[in-house]
Amino acid sequence: MNDDQYSRAVPFYDLWHEDGHVPEIRESLPPLLKGVRGGVMEIGAGTGLITELIVRETRGEVFAVEPALAMRSVLLSRLAGDAEARRRVTVLACGALDVDVDVPVEAVVMISVLQAFPAGRREELWRVLARQLEPGGLLLFNWRERPAPTPGELELMGSYQVGRHAYEVWGQVLGVSGETVRSRFLYRVRQRGVVIGEDEVTSEAHRPGGERLAAELTAAGFVKDEAPDGLAAWRKAA
């Protein structure tokens, strides 16, 4: 999605993700961060839901990379009320392929971001992240092997009551080509059952298989590490 598309989704973002992958990540990520003493880079920090977790579970500097202004605005507002986060977190207004910090980090965390990168750009992504990591540094991202979805009708994915308004997220798979899934999303606001606001976003997600991912990461100089179901852990070769 581009920045304008993100701005349409932001009011729904925390509501939807708190009802999705975020609670699971709060359980599964901390054990993998337990031994991290140095800096951490978060790719695609979004509104800061996982940034908060990283701050709680680590003690070093945190670089929160978020290119979308709408997401970054919420992220900074979230950090504003936490003195410890304000001291340690640097928010970088760039994308993953453009990030360049002057100190190597001990870990890179990338939650619900991998699907934004088509096969042709992942090679560059792994190269950039390897450059940012210290030798032996840890790369963590969420991933599961899933069957390819099939195109279908528009479906309600979540509805969340906030005061008098219901915030609804609708989704529809439009087409699948290889690892690329093209989808349509509707973000609706209802009051007493009447739609009072609606925005539509069409986007592409890329879902590489496990063998393909392993080959890419191995070629980029990473070695697979242990991780719980739903997460992948790779280390930069020492």
Where do the protein language model's features map onto the residues?
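A short glycine-rich, Lys/Arg-flanked "PGG" loop and its adjoining helix->strand segment in the class I
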Residues: 123-135
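Conserved beta-strand signature within the Rossmann-like core of class I S-adenosyl-L-methionine
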Residues: 136-143
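C-terminal lobe and adjacent flexible extensions of AdoMet/dcAdoMet transferase-like proteins
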Residues: 206-238
